[in-house]
Amino acid sequence: MSENKQALQVAALKNGTVIDHIPSEKLFTVVQLLGVEQMKCNITIGFNLDSKKLGKKGIIKIADKFFCDEEINRISVVAPYVKLNIIRDYEVVEKKEVRMPDELHGIVKCANPKCITNNEPMPTLFHVIDKDNCIVKCHYCEKEQKREEITIL
């Protein structure tokens, strides 16, 4: 490991995942969506860090955790331009971008107060009908919602 990495304010990650370029205002929603509070590994969360692209950003470093695409793509609903760096032996071995999945299970609340998911104990299911603009449609009542209208469960 180089001297430069040892001098970082936050320790370099030996193995694990770095989730970067999270808009600061969405950081804690991303933490919730990933279930970070349930994890037993070392986790570092950086909030309001300087960013050339975003002005301010959030970052999450999770030691010894490697997400499957399904787990990580959930966050595309709130943070569509997040970057993932897969770290092994202090080196970035893979870079990924989140991708909007075709369906969202139990993540989004339906905006229709008469929808069965708001009146019965059942999980929500949305079909993504426009990935670029994040427009989703409820499987049960067919109510469409745009990203700015979405409420996360």
Swiss-Prot record:
Co-factor requirement: Zn(2+)
Coiled-coil region(s): none
Gene3D superfamilies referenced in this protein's UniProt entry, alphabetically: Aspartate carbamoyltransferase regulatory subunit, C-terminal domain, Aspartate carbamoyltransferase regulatory subunit, N-terminal domain
UniProt-listed InterPro entries: Asp_carbamoyltransf_reg_N, Asp_carbamoylTrfase_reg, Asp_carbamoyltrfase_reg_C, Asp_carbatrfase_reg_C_sf, Asp_carbatrfase_reg_N_sf
Cofactor binding note from Swiss-Prot or TrEMBL: Binds 1 zinc ion per subunit.
Binding site for Zn(2+): 110, 115, 138, 141
Gene Ontology molecular-function annotations: metal ion binding
Keywords: Metal-binding, Pyrimidine biosynthesis, Zinc
GO biological process: 'de novo' pyrimidine nucleobase biosynthetic process; pyrimidine nucleotide biosynthetic process
Annotated Pfam families: PyrI (PF01948), PyrI_C (PF02748)
UniProt subunit comment: Contains catalytic and regulatory chains.
Family membership noted in the UniProt record: Belongs to the PyrI family.
Function comment: Involved in allosteric regulation of aspartate carbamoyltransferase.
Record-linked NCBIfam families: ATCase_reg
Protein name in the entry: Aspartate carbamoyltransferase regulatory chain
Organism, scientific name: Bacteroides thetaiotaomicron (strain ATCC 29148 / DSM 2079 / JCM 5827 / CCUG 10774 / NCTC 10582 / VPI-5482 / E50)
High-level lineage: Bacteria, Pseudomonadati, Bacteroidota, Bacteroidia, Bacteroidales
